[in-house]
């Protein structure tokens, strides 16, 4: 990149940072937490194998399978991940002119990406020939004087041409790209340094990135203070590389995440509720600076990069999260609807239960859902020991769980809060739930479940005041409560064992939770989950954890709406 182009590119980046600062967040703790999870759970011998296969000039289906398997292992270990989300862009916050621009730019971006991945220059073949046929083809092309026979694809910065000889090219989608947590973990483990040393090195790199794109000279100077940066290979292309390669781009991205309050684009989180605002802000910068989609195949400029990443998933951290589970490309997962005027459901942008009600959608359970709930509740034994726990306030609960150890049956569901200010406090110091994850919860389920509990039931709990207030607010004074009143330490004795055994039962507690210490300061703790609390309280009383298989009473499509209207953008 020439100096003038680099200056213009960074100007775009800086302007996007300023305009999108409201969507940026401090994610250093979450990135480091994911890196620690990878350090403890990832097979680094397999990481080394994948790094080796990524250096091969030609890679086949077996190599792709190993890459995909390792990517899946990483995805299973980290919390920062993007999820599949189909976005339909309609007139709303975005004007019809905005939609026309987005539609045109997505089409241009599609053409550029396809040309970059499958170049059309003479002698280039990216089809499905076998390795033997490719060798034979190379020899024949050389024989007739076509020098292109020596190349099966575009050479990277290190001069090595690498080809994927696979049957299904779609399996390559979303298997590349770098993750700061993975870069941090690989630097730490394979560089044989302390995690903190890697964090400090990347932080300094990130600080330079606030003022310019770090280059080879910058890296050489930083290496004098941080020898771990010697592992960064500045010749590594950012095209079609795995997240296990030590490219300068991967290190810079990780460094951006180490900064608190840096308004770095890498820290943006997008959701169906914020996507319209993000795209609107991007288009504002595009118009002000004349940003555009380049016709030249190759690396993406800042506008191309952010447009692709935002439109790929629409739910997660577009720059830094694991996207292994996402299928399709940006132009497939975000569709521009130029025909609909969006009038039938000009709902609140947060897509919450209240906005859905105002748009004409049912607030409570339907008759068929009530009948399904009634049948499901028959799985509970009215006379069996039953634990109950809630998160949130009794007048505004956000998570409720009931658990019967004898059968392994449990009821576990969530509710959107009405007091957002109090919710954020509770999230910080107790449950760590992201309010946007509650927008898809089923309204009215709390009242319906409590109403369906057996008459004169006896419920055991750790602390009964809040649960009693909740039950009485729903007219269930007939339910008896037994408060075991254990100390905080005793009640959470089996906390780690419970999370280790049953962590797959709940993925809602994504935030960082801290506890204030008596002598000042704060300490990070495990988020409180109503279901996990029920299980660990029972283990504390029983003197051990029963690792039986647990069974959900409520079907998932009752806990979370699966047929919510598409978001109007």
From Swiss-Prot:
GO molecular function: 3'-5' exonuclease activity; identical protein binding; metal ion binding; RNA binding
Keywords: Capsid protein, Helical capsid protein, Host cytoplasm, Host-virus interaction, Hydrolase, Inhibition of host IKBKE by virus, Inhibition of host innate immune response by virus, Inhibition of host RLR pathway by virus, Interferon antiviral system evasion, Manganese, Metal-binding, Ribonucleoprotein, RNA-binding, Viral immunoevasion, Viral nucleoprotein, Virion, Zinc
Biological process per Gene Ontology, one example term: RNA-templated viral transcription
Compartments where located: Virion; Host cytoplasm
Site (Important for exonuclease activity): 466
Positions annotated to bind Mn(2+): 389, 391, 533
Metal-binding recorded as keyword: yes
Domain of life: Viruses
A Pfam family: Arena_nucleocap
Cross-referenced Gene3D superfamilies: 6.10.250.1200, Arenaviral nucleoprotein, C-terminal domain, Arenavirus nucleocapsid protein, head domain
GO cellular component labels: helical viral capsid; host cell cytoplasm; ribonucleoprotein complex; viral nucleocapsid
Listed EC numbers: 3.1.13.-
Residues noted as binding Zn(2+) in the record, renumbered to the chain: 399, 506, 509, 529
Binding site for the cap structure m7GTP: annotated span: 54-241
Main localization category: virion
Family: Belongs to the arenaviridae nucleocapsid protein family.
Subunit structure: Homomultimerizes to form the nucleocapsid. Binds to viral genomic RNA. Interacts with glycoprotein G2. Interacts with protein Z; this interaction probably directs the encapsidated genome to budding sites. Interacts with protein L; this interaction does not interfere with Z-L interaction. Interacts with host IKBKE (via Protein kinase domain); the interaction inhibits IKBKE kinase activity.
Domain notes: The N-terminal region is important for the cap-binding activity while the C-terminal region contains the 3'-5' exoribonuclease activity. A CCHE zinc binding site is present in the C-terminal region and may thus contribute to the substrate binding and/or the specificity of the exonuclease activity.
Function: Encapsidates the genome, protecting it from nucleases. The encapsidated genomic RNA is termed the nucleocapsid (NC). Serves as template for viral transcription and replication. The increased presence of protein N in host cell does not seem to trigger the switch from transcription to replication as observed in other negative strain RNA viruses.
Record-given protein name: Nucleoprotein
